Amino acid sequence: MTSPATLVLIPARMAATRLPGKPLLDIAGLPMVVQVLRRAQAAEIGRVAVATDAPEIAAAVTAHGGEVVMTRADHPSGSDRIFEALQTLDPDRKIETVINLQGDFPTIRPEQIGAVLEPLADPAVDIATLAAEIHTEEEATNPNVVKVIGSPLAADRLRALYFTRATAPWGDGPRYHHIGLYGYRRAALERFVALPPSPLELREKLEQLRALEAGMRIDVGIVDTVPRGVDTPADLETARRVLGG
């Protein structure tokens, strides 16, 4: 059910080295960023907007009926970009929850977007995110696959203790592939962007470690599959096959 207190923001930039102009690449007849926008709208959890510094992206989104907020080009991270967008779109501070949905997840399912809200039902949780169980050794050992190590709270919920590119945790038992979709309480996002980059964040190159090092609580919803991000030409062709039927 759509909530006026929830805002889904999709940060999108043109500066992709491996796939130039990535947000505007065609997938099944629509620009990639519009495919993501459509999935966010179908989730029906709140207002949806694309945050970008690129006029070309803004034009494509508005041409397909989407909402756009223009942001500065010099943001160090997507979190800083969505914070600027939040301030622009909601100066009266009516929004309580902000979803940060990456613009290169064209195959994400609407119900997965909605699932990131569930951990925030606990008022002790500052930030929510998602993960799926790892089933192959290749995935477990790939440094481009971020693993979340957490303490189980329920069959489908972890409290995050650490995120790493290493193969972890050691020993028998499940390992989890982190999915880069975040739900922030507004106060948590405000606190997060005010913090300096942390030592472990810089070492692992994982922004979410800044929150953990500052003592913020991140809970993780467990879902059944990892939506395919699009970072390479091969990823793009896979997304085109999936969405092209």
Curated annotation (Swiss-Prot):
<protein>
    <recommendedName>
        <fullName>3-deoxy-manno-octulosonate cytidylyltransferase</fullName>
        <ecNumber>2.7.7.38</ecNumber>
    </recommendedName>
</protein>
<dbReference type="InterPro" id="IPR003329">
    <property type="entry name" value="Cytidylyl_trans"/>
</dbReference>
<keyword id="KW-0808">Transferase</keyword>
<keyword id="KW-0963">Cytoplasm</keyword>
<comment type="similarity">
    <text>Belongs to the KdsB family.</text>
</comment>
<keyword id="KW-0548">Nucleotidyltransferase</keyword>
<dbReference type="GO" id="GO:0005829">
    <property type="term" value="C:cytosol"/>
</dbReference>
<comment type="pathway">
    <text>Bacterial outer membrane biogenesis; lipopolysaccharide biosynthesis.</text>
</comment>
<dbReference type="InterPro" id="IPR029044">
    <property type="entry name" value="Nucleotide-diphossugar_trans"/>
</dbReference>
<comment type="function">
    <text>Activates KDO (a required 8-carbon sugar) for incorporation into bacterial lipopolysaccharide in Gram-negative bacteria.</text>
</comment>
<dbReference type="GO" id="GO:0033468">
    <property type="term" value="P:CMP-keto-3-deoxy-D-manno-octulosonic acid biosynthetic process"/>
</dbReference>
<keyword id="KW-0448">Lipopolysaccharide biosynthesis</keyword>
<dbReference type="InterPro" id="IPR004528">
    <property type="entry name" value="KdsB"/>
</dbReference>
<dbReference type="GO" id="GO:0009103">
    <property type="term" value="P:lipopolysaccharide biosynthetic process"/>
</dbReference>
<comment type="pathway">
    <text>Nucleotide-sugar biosynthesis; CMP-3-deoxy-D-manno-octulosonate biosynthesis; CMP-3-deoxy-D-manno-octulosonate from 3-deoxy-D-manno-octulosonate and CTP: step 1/1.</text>
</comment>
<dbReference type="Pfam" id="PF02348">
    <property type="entry name" value="CTP_transf_3"/>
</dbReference>
<dbReference type="GO" id="GO:0008690">
    <property type="term" value="F:3-deoxy-manno-octulosonate cytidylyltransferase activity"/>
</dbReference>
